[in-house]
Amino acid sequence: MDKKIVIPGDLISENSKKAGYGTYVKNDKIYSLFCGIENLKEDKVGVIPLAGVYIPSANDVVIGIVIVVTPSNWIMDIASPYDGLFHVSEYPRRIESREMHEVLNVGDSIILRVKDVDNSMKVELALRDSSFHKLKTGQIVEVEPVKVPRVIGHGGSMISMLKKETNCSIFVGQNGRIWIDGKDDDVELLSKALRKIEAEAQRSGLTDRIYNFLKNERSKQKESKPAKFFKSGKKEVKLPKEDHSEEIYRKIDVLLDPNN
């Protein structure tokens, strides 16, 4: 059964103590803040927005693309109305200004963490961990940031299934950028699955739906040789085994219905 679509101002509940993400309280009643999907649980009610831009928040993990190199900063496009600043002091070793283009140049992609966002929306970036995760291979697929929880799933259930069924490496940025790498036919299959998740994010039973889709598409691939459109090159990117922290999983679970 599909979930109920609500618009801003729709009454969600008359129990103000259950107000969750995407809602506001007025006169002890809960109303929808977004145009989105009603998400009802025993202890919380919320709304998953159907669309929206990425607004950076501290500790978000994102995929950034270099757009400007200055003597002390790399200015990053983070798929947001607000650019991010990755200061040279955040790099693992000391480098001179003249070396900055050699480390990261315009157009390069890298996995970063949002270090801080001030009241004026100045976004400071840092390395996700002690490693320097420049994305030298693979490709980046972009989905609406509000659909990211559906790509990851409860406790990473969806992304784990995608990795297993496509044999691809995947990293999902909270800004809607998804890095994928693998063999040509596997990458093509995964890209199709990601587009289907984005298009059907409001549907219930999505994980099972995507699993069946992948099985059917894999059968079609075996029947006819797929056209090659992607070259991954040599594997140069080594990501941590666990792509997302437990804190991120908890945030995701707040937004998703446990039956999906």
Swiss-Prot record:
Subcellular location: Cytoplasm
InterPro entries assigned: Exosome_RNA_bind1/RRP40/RRP4 (IPR026699), KH_dom (IPR004087), KH_dom_type_1 (IPR004088), KH_dom_type_1_sf (IPR036612), NA-bd_OB-fold (IPR012340), Rrp4 (IPR023474), RRP4_N (IPR054371), RRP4_S1 (IPR048565)
Coiled coil: none
Domain annotation KH: ranges: 136-194
GO cellular component terms, A-Z: cytoplasm; exosome (RNase complex)
CDD domains registered for this protein in UniProt: KH-I_Rrp4_prokar, S1_Rrp4
MF (Gene Ontology): poly(A) binding
Keywords: Cytoplasm, Exosome, RNA-binding
GO process terms (BP): CUT catabolic process; exonucleolytic trimming to generate mature 3'-end of 5.8S rRNA from tricistronic rRNA transcript (SSU-rRNA, 5.8S rRNA, LSU-rRNA); poly(A)-dependent snoRNA 3'-end processing; RNA catabolic process; U4 snRNA 3'-end processing
PANTHER family in UniProt: EXOSOME COMPLEX COMPONENT RRP4, PNAS-3 RELATED
Family affiliation: Belongs to the RRP4 family.
NCBIfam families, alphabetized: PRK04163.1-1
Assembly and binders: Component of the archaeal exosome complex. Forms a trimer of Rrp4 and/or Csl4 subunits. The trimer associates with a hexameric ring-like arrangement composed of 3 Rrp41-Rrp42 heterodimers.
Protein name according to UniProt: Exosome complex component Rrp4
Phylogenetic classification of the source organism: Archaea, Methanobacteriati, Methanobacteriota, Stenosarchaea group, Methanomicrobia
